[in-house]
Amino acid sequence: MTVNIYDNANEMANILTETQQYIAWQNAFNAIQNDTDSKALFGEFQEIQMAVQQMMQSQQQPKPEQEKEWDAVAAKVQKDEKINALMEAEQALNTLLTELNDIVTKPVAEAYSKLQK
């Protein structure tokens, strides 16, 4: 019997969309998509996250005015219920995905654990 692991992975992806975690994430995502203010703020927040990550990778320090701007955006994000709901749903979805990854990679992890004995 030939097993096509990609068929199984695609089936898992379809099943994922039926989970409580994915549905909650999709609902939160849609709420932001349908709110121009939340969508704009979330986009700005993502741009800042990317800028911070790039600065960290290149070992640069942000300028004080950048930090002030970033703090102001972060404060707005904390007050936006839709963005907070998305972040909470995303965290739950990521937990599920991590658990699934642990299951899928269990044979590899077990093999490596035998090297330590």
Swiss-Prot record:
Superkingdom, taxonomy of origin: Bacteria
Pfam families named among the record's database cross-references: Com_YlbF
SUPFAM superfamilies per UniProt: YheA/YmcA-like
Family to which this protein belongs: Belongs to the UPF0342 family.
Q: Which Gene3D superfamilies match?
A: YheA/YmcA-like
InterPro entries the UniProt entry points to: Com_YlbF (IPR010368), YheA/YmcA-like_dom_sf (IPR023378)
Q: Give the protein's recorded name.
A: UPF0342 protein LEUM_1212
